């Protein structure tokens, strides 16, 4: 079963000056009938009526590592479009 928890929100402006609202989520999957946990991330971006998101489940089984990743994603205002590239560099 997958749970999703909001960890960070961030308000920035795009290069064109348009307000952009970002939300960073922790994805938590129970494995082996609840005996193990696996963590991932999801980013939601909203500008006006438009929304886009990207999520990558099951990145790590270490809780401290995923929180470090989510903190860094929010700090650097990573968007859904760049999540895959950033994660490849992080791994």
Regions found by a protein language model. Name each.
Residues 1, 16, 41-48, 58, ...:
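Amphipathic, alpha-helical segments enriched in basic
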Residues 1-25:
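Negatively charged, low-complexity tracts enriched in Asp/Glu with abundant Ser/Thr
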Residues 7, 20-21, 35, 63, ...:
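A general marker of short, structured functional hotspots
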Residues 9, 14-15, 30-34, 64-67, ...:
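Residues in flexible loops and secondary-structure boundaries
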Residues 18-33, 84, 88-89:
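A positively charged, amphipathic N-terminal helix/segment that binds anionic biomolecules
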Residues 23-24, 38, 52, 74:
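Intrinsically disordered, low-complexity N-terminal regions enriched in serine/proline/glycine
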Residues 31-55:
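A short, structured beta-strand/loop element
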Residues 48-91:
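Mixed-charge, Lys/Arg-enriched low-complexity segments
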């Amino acid at each position: 079963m997958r749970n999703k928890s909001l960890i960070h929100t961030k308000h920035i402006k795009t290069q064109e000056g348009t307000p952009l609202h970002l939300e960073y989520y922790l994805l938590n999957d129970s494995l082996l009938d609840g005996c193990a946990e696996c963590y991932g991330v999801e980013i939601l971006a909203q500008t006006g009526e438009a929304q886009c998101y990207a999520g990558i489940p099951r990145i790590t089984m270490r809780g401290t590592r995923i929180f470090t990743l989510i903190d860094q994603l929010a700090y650097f205002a990573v968007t859904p479009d760049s999540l895959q590239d950033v994660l490849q560099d992080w791994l």
